Amino acid sequence: MTIAWAIFKKELRTFFVSPLAYVFLGVFLLLAGFFFSMGVSLTGEASLRIMLANLSISLLFLLPLLTMRHFADERRSGTFELLMTAPVPLWAMLLGKWFASLALCVILLLGTLLFPGILAYYGDPDWGVILTGYLGLLLACSAFVSAGLFSSSLTDEPVAAGLIGVVLLL
């Protein structure tokens, strides 16, 4: 399990040292804010239903783009062969990469927790619906990350892996 933990830390570190991470987080939070404001202003009720539904569709397109580099870049840079010849079990490599991507999804969703707070300040939202909505979004993220990792394992090109992942999820 320590090997999976090391891969998890490496993947997170690799993601957050690039400016792409912060652009990705910013775009996601802007989309979430737009969906939240449109959902509340159009329906006039204290509900996150529209935001969560639109975020799940947005994540369907964004998460394969996030996971497209996991295996494809490792193959292109030659580190995949190094990993396969090292005493690293395949399950540990997959688990580390999957948990790192899922941790990024959790970070994305933590950024949207401001919106239920706004609803609670101005209204009386149904917390059971909000919690199950977030749980459903987390489970959808888990499935989307799995599909993205699978598509990344099929090809050496990250862009092709991203396209395969999106098509697979559609």
Give names to the regions the model predicted.
Residues 37-47:
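Short, hydrophobic transmembrane alpha-helix segments
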Residues 164-170:
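Hydrophobic alpha-helical membrane-insertion segments
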Residues 53-73, 108:
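Long, hydrophobic alpha-helical segments
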Residues 48, 66-84, 98:
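Transmembrane helix boundary and interhelical loop/hinge segments in multi-pass membrane proteins
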Residues 35-37, 58, 100-161:
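Secretory targeting signals
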Residues 1-21:
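Aromatic- and glycine-rich beta-strand/loop motifs that create alpha-glucan
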Residues 19-38, 54-63, 170:
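Hydrophobic alpha-helical transmembrane segments of multi-pass membrane transport/permease proteins
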